[in-house]
């Protein structure tokens, strides 16, 4: 049985560029009735077992997203558990909003940088609290991707495993092939990307 690790969910919004040309922010695009793309990513992070969720959105979009998403979500695995007192067994996952640092805007302001900055922010805040809550793994969910979310539950232990990174794939292609599909990375991968 794998050991429990702290996995932080990273949802990059800052630096997102699409060609949809609509009035609403692209992450607010509906993907189902009453379900926006950003809500899909938050639910996905909760479904795979993230203990915290970090949305990297600059100050222009963060209030809109916070109004839609909120500040926490129930873990779907614990929420769906049939027990005598279900409300006592529910687990809340906090959602944090982080803007890209002003010194990095218009210099290192890209979609990839918002992923790295989200991971850095999650680590920095946790380091100030306690070494016991430091993220050991990061799960990246892209709001503009679509796939079967309930199927991720079957891979929950594999995704949270310390042993290897997890990549979703489509036709044999992953994020390494520039597809915006979810993946995980650890602290060593983060250091390699920053250098």
What is each PLM-predicted segment?
Residues 1-30, 35, 39-40, 46-52:
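N-terminal nucleotide-binding beta1-loop-alpha1 segment
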Residues 16-17, 60, 145:
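Short, glycine/serine-rich, charged loops/turns that create anion-binding
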Residues 69-93:
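Short mixed-charge
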Residues 43, 47, 67, 120:
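Short, well-ordered alpha-helices that flank and scaffold nucleotide-derived cofactor binding pockets
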Residues 84-194:
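Conserved beta-loop-beta/alpha segment of the NTase-like Rossmann-fold superfamily
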Residues 52-58:
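Short internal beta-strands
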Residues 11-13, 32, 57, 142, ...:
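Short beta-strand/turn micro-motifs composed of small residues
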Residues 63-69:
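Acidic helix N-cap motif at the loop->helix transition within catalytic regions
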